């Protein structure tokens, strides 16, 4: 999912068929996307640098966090590279509906993680495990991923 929301209901050809017809049936070119990202944002866009290198971050081949930083409290992505900038623009990653959703998801997940930690400390592993399981089904998985990643940074 490009936007991180879990409303995937479309299959996108990452490299558009019009630009790469031989990749039409290439499994590595099929991405789950929400219909908004696929139809209204990306469409047939696939920007390239002057040397022909694709500018969109391919999350199946590289770590998006090398090009993007999620500002958790406001739910916005910040570009760390030209490729990150192109990815934000093409997919509309900072659309209001997404930034609000990520900000709310951050508050919710932070609260759930605090509750989980408290339950572990109180010796209640069963309820802590229930919270862990519920985190798997929260929208905006990119928020939880960023929280866990940033937790390990100095």
Predicted regions mapped to residue ranges:
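Sequence-level detector for tyrosine residue identity
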Residues: 2, 28, 65, 77, ...
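Histidine-centered nuclease catalytic patch
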Residues: 2-32, 41-55
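Surface-exposed loop/turn and secondary-structure junction residues enriched for glycine/proline
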Residues: 17-20, 28, 59-60, 71, ...
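Post-HExxH zinc-binding segment in Zn-dependent metallohydrolases
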Residues: 35
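Phosphate-backbone recognition surface of nucleic-acid-processing proteins
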Residues: 38
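Conserved, surface-exposed functional patches that form binding/active-site neighborhoods
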Residues: 45-118
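C-terminal, charged low-complexity interaction regions
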Residues: 88-154
